Amino acid sequence: MKKNIALFAGSFDPFTRGHADIVERSLAIFDEVIIAIGINEQKRTLFSAERRQEQIARYYASRPAIGVITYSGLTVDLVRQTGATALVRGIRSGSDFEYERTLADLNRHLSGVDTVLLCTDTRLSFISSSAVRELISFGRDVSDFLPEGFVLD
């Protein structure tokens, strides 16, 4: 029997409680979730793709249904390479929905893959990786915005 595999792609710089919430809720729908860390050489990141992969893989080490990979190129090509059955995306607001809907339509046109949009838990909707990066740049404690037990190193 073919497994239902979700591909959850993003920069995850850093991985937040909101991301972890989407992963957990995806597992209620899919057999496996692949967290795919996109590499974009033009984008300045706080952590290298390798470090992000190590951090997230360490956090989910005891969870065999969750994989962590890095990739470059188009996400729709990665869908084919991994055998994923759908993309999963989290949305925090109406503006996120508009952006994600357009992207979902494009991905479906290019590859036929469906996108499952999950609304972020309202208690987490204010959390974004960019806000966490900014807090880190000011030396602030960001542990409230990261999954419990998640280590940034």
From Swiss-Prot:
GO cellular component: cytoplasm
Main subcellular localisation: cytoplasm
Residue sites binding ATP per the record: 11-12, 19, 90-92, 100, 124-130
Residue ranges the record marks as coiled coil: none
Record field: catalytic activity: (R)-4'-phosphopantetheine + ATP + H(+) = 3'-dephospho-CoA + diphosphate
Subcellular location field: Cytoplasm
Pathway terms, separated by semicolons: Cofactor biosynthesis; coenzyme A biosynthesis; CoA from (R)-pantothenate: step 4/5
Gene Ontology terms: biological process: coenzyme A biosynthetic process
Pfam families attached to this UniProt entry: CTP_transf_like
Cofactor: Mg(2+)
Protein name, as recorded: Phosphopantetheine adenylyltransferase
Organism field: Porphyromonas gingivalis (strain ATCC BAA-308 / W83)
Phylogenetic lineage: Bacteria, Pseudomonadati, Bacteroidota, Bacteroidia, Bacteroidales
